[in-house]
């Protein structure tokens, strides 16, 4: 069988696999096609006590066979199997007698190799769906005939390859294929993520029943491994750790304190001006109780006026650079993160200089986690993962330090929930370990900065589609080309539910002239927000359903919000000019304080994984005839429930969080001067990321 997409590319693949330095008898190899969830697959397999190793997709089949791997899992990825830049792979991986599970892109690869076809269809699936499964298939043994799974793809299997049968469907889309005699299985959905309710059962079926894994692999003590790495890397040098006061940097500092002598650790907390209310003071007090001496630096002025160097343009491939605007005049989320990251490093260098330390003898320690590196496409985590957003602690400058071996990141293979467990093992107090994550750039990335509205040529058509969806029961009586498009993107069951919802409730759905970051089909999306308002009391289950449905039909929408208050008669088509000024930050800081204070008092803080509060440049309720300028802003409450921060769902009022708690937040935030409306984010991840920027 010929090698796919370029034989020469495989001649040098395999590396350590070919020279015999490693042996993986009984282990599972995960071939990385560039999925955002590649490391999650690895983690789920290891949770089932099976050793797993991640290697490039182009690893040759003979190398996999020689090293004794028992089975192969192929991850998802952002490419199309027919794209010119589709990653190279060896099709012999399917014919060496090893059980194979192809996930998402991996399933499409498998189907294509055996003569099936894959097409880009009008329906894009991004979110949680009910699928029907054949539970007589070995992969789905023990499951119900209908299962809840995460789907995130644009391409779909069209013609199923000879020898394979369809074992799962999402409406009329193929969601699973199998060739039981050859032990080849494909899942269009993601069994590795928490949003797939019985994903662990599916992986267990593959590992134990199909591949015959023994389940004898236990991961060595994470704490001891981290301490060993710190000691080996640092030796007698000093380590500078930048403390945000969050779980990650605190656990990182506690590990450094345990691994090294106290005088080797320089703990610095930089108040960047984007902290929450009274945050810096509480950070210093909490860490002093742990015996960690912290140097607090007020650097708000340096951050507000910080700049960085950027490419001349996104299209310019030359090494030419330009100086960015100052941070307090920057609207681009990516530029904001880069400026903040580089300013952090500059201040760290200043601290080293003030303490008369030699830079070449000092390491920079960070509490960077695996999801951070995956989302910013760092080569440490994945050679292929598509960029979703730039993390403030994974900028070009820090990558350079990492290349020089001067950055130490002992938590780089941990996910958030694992860090909490490690923190408890280290003896950290529960109030620190269980606190909600807070991004390093702080409130700076929770302000949607804008000078102009985001309105592209697709705005009118998308707005019309949303009108049809919101009034579907009436729209079906008036034939329209866009109505046919809505029907083509939905199942009969979806249309039935949409009829029911729009018959019972008076809804209004429209685009908001702002954009937020999301993740769709393993790629970054930078798309519109859909707003929904109603004269009725919100039916939250129906709203959540609409939030799942709308991004499937409108691929240029990655987030859906409910707008509290009376129906929005005239959606805003302009924005309030918004930058990172002290007044804007003070408004958001107070809104964040009110919301989190109410959540803590309710006793539900532990049930919500994270709750970003976002300030948007939107001013509602203006009479267009009076030409009143946009001068107010609106707040978004983004509740988020997750086990790994790679995927997650919003807390549904009335289920995961009491309705009265949410309404109390709305009431208190509305009292803040300059606030127009309060919105509630209904979006799961994907298609929306945890943060809005």
Swiss-Prot record:
Pathway: Purine metabolism; GMP biosynthesis; GMP from XMP (L-Gln route): step 1/1. It catalyses: XMP + L-glutamine + ATP + H2O = GMP + L-glutamate + AMP + diphosphate + 2 H(+). Gene3D superfamilies: 3.30.300.10, 3.40.50.880, HUPs (3.40.50.620). Residues 217-435 form the GMPS ATP-PPase domain. The modification Phosphothreonine is found at residue 318. SUPFAM superfamilies: Adenine nucleotide alpha hydrolases-like (SSF52402), Class I glutamine amidotransferase-like (SSF52317), GMP synthetase C-terminal dimerisation domain (SSF54810). Coiled coil: none annotated. Its main location: cytoplasm. The modification Phosphoserine is found at residues 8, 332. GO terms for molecular function: ATP binding; GMP synthase (glutamine-hydrolyzing) activity; GMP synthase activity. It is an enzyme of class 6 (ligase). It is found in: Cytoplasm, Cytosol. The modification N-acetylalanine is found at residue 2. The keyword Phosphoprotein applies. The active site is at residues 104, 190, 192. The modification N6-acetyllysine is found at residue 9. Its cofactor is Mg(2+). InterPro entries: Class_I_gatase-like, GATASE, GMP_synth_C, GMP_synth_GATase, GMPS_ATP_PPase_dom, NAD/GMP_synthase, Rossmann-like_a/b/a_fold. Residues 27-216 form the Glutamine amidotransferase type-1 domain. NCBIfam families: guaA_Nterm, PRK00074.1. This is GMP synthase [glutamine-hydrolyzing]. The gene is GMPS.
């Amino acid at each position: 069988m010929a090698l796919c997409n370029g034989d020469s590319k495989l001649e040098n693949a395999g590396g350590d696999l070919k020279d015999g330095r490693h042996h993986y008898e009984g282990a599972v190899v995960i071939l990385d096609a560039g999925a955002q969830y590649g490391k999650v697959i690895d983690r789920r397999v290891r949770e089932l006590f099976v050793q797993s190793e991640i290697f490039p997709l182009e690893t040759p089949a003979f190398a996999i066979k020689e090293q004794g791997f028992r089975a192969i899992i192929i991850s998802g990825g952002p490419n199309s199997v027919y794209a010119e830049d589709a990653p190279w792979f060896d099709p012999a991986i399917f014919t060496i007698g090893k059980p194979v599970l192809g996930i998402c892109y991996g399933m499409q690869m498998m189907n294509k190799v055996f003569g099936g076809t894959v097409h880009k269809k009008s329906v894009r699936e991004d979110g949680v769906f009910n699928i029907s499964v054949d539970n007589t298939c070995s992969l789905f043994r023990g499951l119900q005939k209908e299962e809840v799974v995460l789907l995130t793809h644009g391409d779909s299997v069209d013609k199923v390859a000879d020898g394979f049968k369809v074992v799962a469907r999402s409406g009329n889309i193929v969601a699973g294929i199998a060739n039981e005699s050859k032990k080849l299985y494909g899942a269009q959905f993601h069994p590795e993520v928490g949003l797939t309710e019985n994903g662990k059962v599916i992986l267990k079926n593959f590992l134990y029943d199909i591949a015959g894994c023994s389940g004898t692999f236990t991961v060595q003590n994470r704490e001891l491994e981290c301490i060993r790495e710190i000691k080996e890397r640092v030796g007698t040098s000093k380590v500078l750790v930048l403390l945000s006061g969050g779980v990650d940097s605190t656990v990182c500092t506690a590990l450094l304190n345990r691994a090294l002598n106290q005088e080797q650790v320089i703990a610095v907390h930089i108040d960047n001006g984007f902290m929450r209310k009274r945050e810096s003071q509480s950070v210093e007090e909490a860490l002093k109780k742990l015996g960690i001496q912290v140097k607090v630096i007020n650097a708000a002025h340096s951050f507000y006026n910080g700049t960085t160097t950027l490419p001349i343009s996104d299209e310019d491939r030359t090494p030419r650079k330009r100086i960015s605007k100052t941070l307090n005049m920057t609207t681009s989320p990516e530029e904001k993160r880069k400026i903040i990251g580089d300013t952090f490093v500059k201040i760290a260098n200043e601290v080293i200089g003030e303490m008369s330390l030699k830079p070449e003898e000092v390491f920079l320690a960070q509490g960077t986690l695996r999801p951070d590196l995956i989302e910013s496409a760092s080569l440490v985590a994945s050679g292929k993962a598509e960029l979703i957003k730039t993390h403030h602690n994974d900028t070009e400058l820090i990558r350079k330090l990492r290349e020089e071996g001067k950055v130490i990141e002992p938590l780089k293979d941990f996910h958030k929930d694992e860090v909490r467990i490690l923190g408890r093992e280290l003896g950290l107090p529960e109030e620190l370990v269980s606190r909600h994550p807070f991004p390093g750039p702080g409130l700076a990335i929770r302000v949607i900065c804008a000078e102009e509205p985001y309105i592209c040529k697709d705005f009118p058509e998308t707005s019309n589609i949303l009108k049809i969806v919101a009034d579907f029961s009436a729209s079906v009586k008036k034939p329209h080309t866009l109505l046919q498009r809505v029907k083509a993107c939905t199942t009969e069951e979806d249309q039935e539910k949409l009829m029911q919802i729009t018959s019972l409730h008076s809804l209004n759905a429209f685009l908001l002239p702002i954009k937020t970051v999301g993740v769709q089909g393993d790629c970054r999306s930078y798309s519109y927000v859909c707003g929904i308002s109603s004269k009725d009391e919100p039916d939250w289950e129906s709203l959540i359903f609409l939030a799942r449905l709308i991004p499937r039909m409108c691929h240029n929408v990655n987030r859906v919000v409910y707008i509290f208050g009376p129906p929005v008669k005239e959606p805003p088509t302009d924005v309030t000019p918004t930058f990172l000024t002290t007044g804007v930050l003070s408004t958001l800081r107070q809104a964040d304080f009110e919301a989190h204070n109410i959540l803590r008092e309710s006793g539900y803080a532990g049930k919500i994984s994270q709750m970003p509060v976002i300030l948007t440049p939107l001013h509602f309720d203006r009479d267009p005839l009076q030409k009143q300028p946009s001068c107010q802003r609106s707040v978004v409450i983004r509740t988020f429930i997750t086990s790994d921060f790679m995927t997650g769902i919003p807390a549904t009022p009335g289920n995961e969080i009491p309705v009265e708690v949410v309404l109390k937040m709305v009431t208190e935030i509305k009292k803040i001067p300059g606030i127009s409306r309060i919105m509630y984010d209904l979006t799961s991840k994907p298609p929306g990321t945890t943060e809005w920027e």
